[in-house]
């Protein structure tokens, strides 16, 4: 997929791939930290991938103007997208913010912005790492 095609995707599609990419980042990080027991992996992964965690990261990013205008465009596209799925363990607003978060990861991945995606991950890690067991 080229950049132009990626930029035309709807917010849900971007969040779909962004969710998968972010999940891989988290899983690799946890394994690298030496966590191997399934219960601990799941418990700690949830601290990164839950809608509440992703909303917390976006809030922290907003406080320091971390997101570029380009990224904000795709965050809003994801946040404002109408999804058929419903929030499981959170309110609708938090769920939509997390969809926006995942959409940013998706657009960065699909447009091959690897350095910026790493910066995004590093910021996310710093924001959530203090909550790890």
From Swiss-Prot:
Subcellular location: Cytoplasm
A GO cellular-component term linked to this record: cytoplasm
A molecular function GO annotation: ribonuclease III activity
Predominant location category: cytoplasm
Keywords (A to Z) from UniProt: Cytoplasm, Endonuclease, Hydrolase, Magnesium, Nuclease, Ribosome biogenesis, RNA-binding, rRNA processing, rRNA-binding
General function of this protein: Involved in correct processing of both the 5' and 3' ends of 23S rRNA precursor. Processes 30S rRNA precursor transcript even in absence of ribonuclease 3 (Rnc); Rnc processes 30S rRNA into smaller rRNA precursors.
HAMAP family named among the record's database cross-references: RNase_Mini_III (MF_01468)
Stated name of the protein: Mini-ribonuclease 3
């Amino acid at each position: 997929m080229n950049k132009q095609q990626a930029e035309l995707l709807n917010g849900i599609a971007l969040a779909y791939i962004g969710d998968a990419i972010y999940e891989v980042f988290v899983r690799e990080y946890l394994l690298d930290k030496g966590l191997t027991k399934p219960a601990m992996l799941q418990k700690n992964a949830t601290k990164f991938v839950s809608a509440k965690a992703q909303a917390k990261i976006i809030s922290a990013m907003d406080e320091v103007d971390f997101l570029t205008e380009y990224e904000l465009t795709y965050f809003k596209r994801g946040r404002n997208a109408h999804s058929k799925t419903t929030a499981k363990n959170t309110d609708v607003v938090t769920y939509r913010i997390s969809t926006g978060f995942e959409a940013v990861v998706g657009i960065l991945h699909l447009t091959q912005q690897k350095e910026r995606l790493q910066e995004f991950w590093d910021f996310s890690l710093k924001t959530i790492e203090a909550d790890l067991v």
